[in-house]
Amino acid sequence: METIDMTSQEENFMRKIEADEKIEPKDWMPEAYRKNLIRQMSQHAHSEVIGMQPEGNWITRAPSLRRKAVLLSKVQDEAGHGLYLYSATETLGISRAELIAALQSGEAKYASIFNYPTLTWGDVGAIGWLVDGAAIVNQVSLQRTSYGPYSRGMIRICKEESFHQRQGYEALLALAKGSPEQKQMAQDSLNRFYWPALMMFGPHDSESAHSAKSMEWKIKRETNDDLRQKFIDQTVPQIEVLGLEHPDKEIKWNEERGHYDAGEIDWDEFYSVINGNGHCNRQRVEHHIAAHDEGTWVRDAITAYNEKKNAKKAQNVA
């Protein structure tokens, strides 16, 4: 069996990983570990920012002032989550400008579910309940990730995501307990967003290019399939409370496994969407580019102010 000689730096790095110690920005780390983190963390940040679009589209059309205020607060939270995660990613030696350029060029990915349109108010509830619910399952696990800034960011973000999930479920519950037309709207939203929510956990681990190494380095603490199973299990009783039909006609409790057996995901659809062929891929990125360009003057003004402030400070010191 071939043995791989490790340097003292690599040995110390792996010792920390195995001891569940956090890797901090100034610690030595393998370049592949750094790149893997940049890929995952930036994708997470991009998802928070792009995810504002399908919900923000409904702020002016929310059915009541209360719903509008809650949705506005939620979308603002998502912006904050993106900023936390961009800042955490920058500790790995990459600039915000580089991260945004990768998103806008299509080089970097974001959660595929945000390339589906929000056609009704029920979709806003489904996003809060299913999409943020899936995100919580993933992010609770990431609170134990090996990279310190990412772990600490997840602890704060999860507290806010739990509110997002509850507001989405409560909105859908109101529809499900309403008129026949409202209940049908809730059912339609569930049918359209359930399967894309399952896709959020990524491909089967056997087909994932990054899972094995991410697990070894404890960037990820649970596999894609294990996280997806948790989400499936918790969603079944929630659907029952709503009084809606489960979109997966093959869902069945497996006494031996202690989990629900589920139907197979349409992976052709998954890969088609992440490769840019979803309903809204082009629209989402174009909107981001337009908003970024419109904000250039703000960034320039802040830069000029800071330069002037620093120059004045240096002059006073001299």
State what each model feature region is:
Residues 22-42, 102-128, 145, 178-182, ...:
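Acidic/His metal-coordination segments adjacent to aromatic residues that form catalytic metal sites
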Residues 184-318:
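Extended, helix-rich structural scaffolds rather than catalytic motifs
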Residues 28-33, 51-73, 135-150:
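Helix-loop segments that flank and shape redox-cofactor active sites
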Residues 145-196:
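Glycine- and acidic-residue-rich phosphate-binding/metal-coordinating active-site segment common to enzymes
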